Amino acid sequence: MKKKLLVILGAGSSTPLGMPSVPDVDQLMAQWGIEWATWRGTTDHFGKLWQSAEMYYKSGPTGPRPALNFEKVLGDMVALAHWMEPPPWGDTLRQAACGGAPPPELIFQSQEPECEAVEDLLADEGDLVNVEHETIGESLDEVVPASEESPTGKYGAYIELMDELSFLLEKLAQHMRTLCQRFDPATGAAERYRMLLRGLREKFDVGIYNLNYDAAALNALPGSYTGFGEMGTFEPSVIIERSRWDFVYHLHGSVHHSLSQQFGDEICWRRSLDEHFFDGSEGRSNDKRSEGRSFPITTLIAGGFKLDQLLVEPFHLLYATLVRHVYMADAILIGGYGFGDVHVNRALKNRFSRGDGQLPVMILDLAGDRTGPMAFRYDLWAMEVCSAFGADGHFFAEPGRLSPPVPGDLTARGTFEVDAQHRIAIWHGGFVGAERRLPGIIEWLDGAADGVLIPDSGQ
């Protein structure tokens, strides 16, 4: 029986294939935010919140700090939309923090003056309604809270924020699908990507959790189970009962995902990317999750509050199986992942904090020109790696050498940075670049000593 290899793929694994990096998506979101604001004739809230977060981070001391990217700002949009919902449906901290006043530097074109809104609310609490259940229409211009005759009024700011957020998520889904339609499988990078995953599958029973929306892993391993049946319907019972792995699960959504109908909330699987897709649309009703926060009904997960976003299928069950498979795995390979998703990091940390034996963990990453040895790194990526696996950067070394290794030199020599005590190996030459060391990687994941990672060992 083959050993089980759990593979977790982040954005860096598919950027050599023409898929966007996180900074690429940052720029796209900025452009789409301006497009939305121009179309609506209002403020680009994504851009404003980006500037606000950037200013906040810069006001702190130098040193490690949270990453500012599109996902952070999308999460802020969710939080602000909840903050701007009128009582009693919004965030109670707004009353404690600022006496119920809105943010002073943000402008919402369709929000009535705060003093009038508060007077209305105090005058008639019976008019308070949940927008989730009391909205109609497909666009902002048609969304009408039950107690209002137009989108202006108590819910104006909330509607604007959710409208732009839905627009951005829909644009992201469409953009990723277009890139996958244009994907060229004949490139050298695509061939090496396929050889890497197929080589792993020959030796192991491989289960892949793709944190990206692209179809790169599916293209490399056609026939892998996705969690959806022949007719495109989600199959929870099959997922739960499946003993064989050989799957590619898209934990955060896929370009193959579509809402079953334009105003439905069930996600189905479209085999061909040329079919018609429904990715959610701005202005439609939203789904309430924990603490009353609203989230757009869409085909993918992006932004903050991911545990809330994971509460709907297929994401809910796929996350549950990730936790299960972390415990079942005989070895783990992580490719191009920035360790920025707490729900993934925590699943790993819970498994590795038990102290009941270490399994091999191979991390395939692309180091920058100025990246230092793990022993001297204090950036968030290195800190999260050590936290997830209960390791310490000072234990990492190049097999057969004593001095702390420089990642650029390791890549040039075709070797790894290894923590022998915790059985963690880091390849700094990129996901696709690791294909040239595939035999050694396979042997090491299968339990061989660290020596197989030394180039002159014949691997």
Where are these regions (language model features)?
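SIR2/sirtuin-family catalytic core signature
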Residues: 1-17, 22-54, 241-244, 313, ...
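A short acidic-Thr-Gly-centered motif at the start of a beta-strand
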Residues: 1, 192-203, 318-327
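Glycine- and acidic
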Residues: 304-308, 329-331
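A Trp-anchored, charged/polar loop motif used as the substrate-binding/catalytic surface
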Residues: 187-193, 232-234, 307-321
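Gly-rich Lys/Arg/Thr-decorated short loops/hinges at beta-loop-alpha junctions or inter-strand turns
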Residues: 298-304
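Generic alpha-helical structural element
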Residues: 185, 206-209, 311, 333, ...
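Extended, H/D-rich, highly charged conserved domains that either
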Residues: 46-174, 181-189, 193-298
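Intrinsic disorder/low-structure terminal segments
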Residues: 45, 69, 107, 276-277, ...
